[in-house]
């Protein structure tokens, strides 16, 4: 059974893709495939961050501390 990549693994992969795309020396088809992979990684990373944010808000709310915690979606 294969381990799921961690948040950090996905972020590192995204950084690598961005670096390769910035060089501009990849064939169009490869660049498009890399871009699609990058978009998928961004969505996964955003979901992970949102889930973590929601969990923190619940923990804080359950402890009756900062119950008016505002979450931002920047």
Curated annotation (Swiss-Prot):
It comes from the Bacteria. It catalyses: Exonucleolytic cleavage in either 5'- to 3'- or 3'- to 5'-direction to yield nucleoside 5'-phosphates. It is found in: Cytoplasm. Its main location: cytoplasm. Gene3D superfamilies: Exonuclease VII, small subunit. GO terms for biological process: DNA catabolic process. InterPro entries: Exonuc_VII_S (IPR003761), Exonuc_VII_ssu_sf (IPR037004). Heterooligomer composed of large and small subunits. Belongs to the XseB family. Bidirectionally degrades single-stranded DNA into large acid-insoluble oligonucleotides, which are then degraded further into small acid-soluble oligonucleotides. This is Exodeoxyribonuclease 7 small subunit. The gene is xseB.
